[in-house]
Amino acid sequence: SLTKTXXTIIXAMWAKRLFTSYPQTKTYFPHFDLHPDSAQLRKNIDNIHSALSKLSELHAYILRVDPVNFKLLSHXFLV
């Protein structure tokens, strides 16, 4: 489980990095409420490992997304 500080850092990074660095990615996540006070983000931030694991499996095995595109996402986290 994440600490409150770690959750705050991840939430700030997510909002500032991925959708700011790659605004075109918003088109793939129209159902995400990305506002600063989003109940959806607060509800799921402590379970981010599980959520990303399921997302990884979905992209790799069901949607068959080219792994090259994962570099864009990881870059957004690292920037």
From Swiss-Prot:
Globin domain mapped to chain residues: 1-79
Domain of life: Eukaryota
Coiled-coil region(s): none
Membrane-crossing residue ranges in chain numbering: none
Modified residues (Phosphoserine): 38, 53
Listed GO CC annotations: blood microparticle; haptoglobin-hemoglobin complex; hemoglobin complex
Residue(s) carrying N-acetylserine: 1
Signal peptide: none
Name of one Pfam family that matches: Globin
Keywords for this protein: Acetylation, Heme, Iron, Metal-binding, Oxygen transport, Phosphoprotein, Transport
InterPro entries: Globin (IPR000971), Globin-like_sf (IPR009050), Globin/Proto (IPR012292), Hemoglobin_oxygen_transport (IPR050056)
MF terms in GO: haptoglobin binding; heme binding; metal ion binding; organic acid binding; oxygen binding; oxygen carrier activity; peroxidase activity
GO-annotated biological processes: hydrogen peroxide catabolic process
Binding residues for heme b: 59
Purpose: The zeta chain is an alpha-type chain of mammalian embryonic hemoglobin.
PANTHER family: HEMOGLOBIN FAMILY MEMBER, HEMOGLOBIN SUBUNIT ZETA
Stated family: Belongs to the globin family.
Subunit text: Heterotetramer of two zeta chains and two epsilon chains.
Protein name listed in UniProt: Hemoglobin subunit zeta
Organism from which the protein derives: Notamacropus eugenii
